[in-house]
Amino acid sequence: MLINPTDSDAVGNSILMANKANIPVITLDRAANKGEVVSHVASDNRMGGKMAADYIAQKTGSESKVIQLEGISGTSAARERGEGFNTGAKEHKFNLLASQPADFDRTKGLNVMQNLLTAHPAVQAVFAQNDEMALGALRALQTAGRTDVLVVGFDGTNDGIKAVEGGKLGATIAQRPDQIGIVGVQIADKVLKGEKVDSTVPVELELVVKQ
């Protein structure tokens, strides 16, 4: 069984039921917090977070004043992207002014960014753990006339890529959902054949910037 969980906690009961029925489970994109899975296929979120930090350092220099907008607390995506970004932030000696949740939501991204901008007007760059929050933050910055602040998103959604191509969003770390699906089916095929599979299979990401 291949599952792409929208909620890492809620999916647990379904996986436990599959475990009882001896049905092998493979999770895609987001990990489950309960139950046993034979393999988890997902973007290398830690690497993506680090890529975002590296890009910010490249554009604004080390020791930059940065704000991070976090995803939904407890999700593997938010945790791993945050860990990767924080690793890069330490490496580049960023001054992390604030790191607050906006729950992967565009409207919350806008509201949280408005508040953080008031509290930290010296901000030079924003890393949002998904494109929705990045676009919300972008709107808040535009409204405040702060087009000097670099914003980097994550996921490579259609809206995110459009904003990058329009010169509004600095960059987005693009997931490759087609590749996650392809690898997931390949792993399922191996499981059905009784072959050994890795417990975690990372899928590479791509930095999307304006050409």
Task: For each feature predicted by the language model, list its residue ranges.
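Short beta-strand->loop
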Residues: 42, 67-76, 101-103
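Flexible loop/hinge segments that line or gate small-molecule binding clefts
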Residues: 8-47, 58, 65, 157-165, ...
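Loop/turn elements at helix/coil->beta-strand transitions in domains of secreted/extracellular proteins
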Residues: 20-25, 62-65, 91-96, 121-124, ...
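Hydrophobic alpha-helical
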Residues: 2-19, 85, 98, 102-162
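Extracytoplasmic/periplasmic mature domains of Sec-exported, cell-envelope-associated bacterial proteins
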Residues: 3-4, 19, 24, 28, ...
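Short, solvent-exposed amphipathic alpha-helices that sit
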Residues: 48-55, 76-94, 108, 112, ...
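Hinge/cleft segment of the Venus flytrap/periplasmic-binding protein
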Residues: 69, 73-77, 87-89, 176-211
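Hydrophobic alpha-helical segments within soluble ligand-binding/sensing domains
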Residues: 41-66, 108-110, 157-160, 175-193
